[in-house]
Amino acid sequence: MKLVLTQEVPGLGSPGDIVDVADGYGRNYLVPRRYAILATRGAERQVAQIKRARDARAVRDLDHAKEIAGQLSGLSVRLVSRAGKEGRLFGSVTAADVVSAVTDAGGPALDRRRVELSTPIKSLGSHTVAVHLHPEVSAKLTVQVTSA
């Protein structure tokens, strides 16, 4: 059975892909849940329209990610946290803390899932944090953790 996917289906494809699946899988799962529609001539035209829209969105997303990376490139953020005598923090600095500090410093709004901390920041000092904005674009920013 040939279907046109309308949503992302893990292991099968992305919206606009024409896939060949077993009749039962298509009829009982994909079509009723509106993950796919039957592949007809009208659906194939719709696929072409979806692909054009997806390509335009990909270009727009890449440009937006490059713009945000430019804003983050020279940004240094300062976080104040309580710490012990040896410079170890009571708790840790998380990705959400970094995002709120960037926003407070006048930087762009970020999603905390885009901020990559290899390990939580648990000490005072300067730390470099990677922000993955797009599969092709990432930026690094400096987080300065100081004692309260």
Curated annotation (Swiss-Prot):
Pfam families: Ribosomal_L9_C, Ribosomal_L9_N. SUPFAM superfamilies: L9 N-domain-like (SSF55658), Ribosomal protein L9 C-domain (SSF55653). GO terms for molecular function: rRNA binding; structural constituent of ribosome. One of its GO terms (cellular component) is ribosome. Keywords: Ribonucleoprotein, Ribosomal protein, RNA-binding, rRNA-binding. One of its GO terms (biological process) is translation. Binds to the 23S rRNA. Belongs to the bacterial ribosomal protein bL9 family. This is Large ribosomal subunit protein bL9. It comes from Parafrankia sp. (strain EAN1pec).
